From Swiss-Prot:
One of its GO terms (cellular component) is cytosol. Interacts with RAB26. Interacts with PPP1R9B. Interacts with GGA1, GGA2 and GGA3. It comes from Homo sapiens (Human). The gene is ADRA2B. A lipid is attached at residue 442 (S-palmitoyl cysteine). Residues 293-311 have a biased composition (Acidic residues). It is a multi-pass membrane protein. The record marks 92 as: Implicated in ligand binding. The lineage of its organism: Eukaryota, Metazoa, Chordata, Craniata, Vertebrata. Disulfide bonds join 85-164. It is linked to Epilepsy, familial adult myoclonic, 2: A form of familial myoclonic epilepsy, a neurologic disorder characterized by cortical hand tremors, myoclonic jerks and occasional generalized or focal seizures with a non-progressive or very slowly progressive disease course. Usually, myoclonic tremor is the presenting symptom, characterized by tremulous finger movements and myoclonic jerks of the limbs increased by action and posture. In a minority of patients, seizures are the presenting symptom. Some patients exhibit mild cognitive impairment. FAME2 inheritance is autosomal dominant. This is Alpha-2B adrenergic receptor.
Amino acid sequence: MDHQDPYSVQATAAIAAAITFLILFTIFGNALVILAVLTSRSLRAPQNLFLVSLAAADILVATLIIPFSLANELLGYWYFRRTWCEVYLALDVLFCTSSIVHLCAISLDRYWAVSRALEYNSKRTPRRIKCIILTVWLIAAVISLPPLIYKGDQGPQPRGRPQCKLNQEAWYILASSIGSFFAPCLIMILVYLRIYLIAKRSNRRGPRAKGGPGQGESKQPRPDHGGALASAKLPALASVASAREVNGHSKSTGEKEEGETPEDTGTRALPPSWAALPNSGQGQKEGVCGASPEDEAEEEEEEEEEEEECEPQAVPVSPASACSPPLQQPQGSRVLATLRGQVLLGRGVGAIGGQWWRRRAQLTREKRFTFVLAVVIGVFVLCWFPFFFSYSLGAICPKHCKVPHGLFQFFFWIGYCNSSLNPVIYTIFNQDFRRAFRRILCRPWTQTAW
């Protein structure tokens, strides 16, 4: 890339200040993402390790690539040694390629989670995700190695002003652009199109599925022991479920939480059309598990963790439960403890309802997280497409289609800006990341989840 006239002092200061802010914001934001995933219970799903690796790649761009690109841009020539130029170019391709291959892997993970939920979620373990991440980095390394092995034609070198540029041969430009950007983009578009079709087909079957397993929406289970189930709806359970529809926080059907028995997995939740017993004294909002009013100020920041501590669990009837006053229960029944009350379970109805509820909540979480990742992928493509398009166009018809230097540099830096945008996207579109960021910034962080 030939450089134009040097920038004025004012322009140099403005550009340096803006890029320095970009570097600091990228490091801070992506470090926050890594801490959030590693320390937040609501973000400890194995697939979120993809986001940790992606954030690490963005931090490496901000620390090893952008500062030297800034110096090269402002000085108009490569100030550093020739060996570092070759390493710098290879790392630039490596980190950019790893970012888009990460997104491609995330897209495939989303597709398998939506299309083969039961089969795939049982195999979606941290070890398996880490193996996929390692494969992603190996693919990126293979694509980035040619500049180190084959120097090729780097164009004329001005006297006294060394330049640091990639191989200028058309075959390499086209091959690297296809391997680093266009091919992964095509895969992601096809995968997300398939996910959209699956979701559309699922929505068409929605009215049949909303009534629960094997029953319509209007059907109510018969009371056990003379009216054990009241006629009221289950707002508390619905609110817990909606609060837990978070960023991919789904467990496989074969997994259990600590302290959870096989019997609990079948009786811990009910479809929303089933009924709840009114809980006396619970009409207005209180601190979770009878917390004192002083603790309510912290409740908003730790809502997810508190809900997990008191999430719906089927427990044997006893004189008092963990989260509510004692109630008189029919013999042989079980009670479902929730944040705002109790639900009495008749005999034999918990297993089917629990499986239905967990399956439906899992699908909802997958759909919401898929939307967030679609935004991440869309922003990435918007940021990098102008650069790769103009870069490839210059190789196809270098004399008549070459983009002006200033515009090409603008596209170049817009691509780098993408490294700072993912934390912003997570904050805007995902409440779990918002809560995790708030907790990290306002109090000491806790033990990592892995």
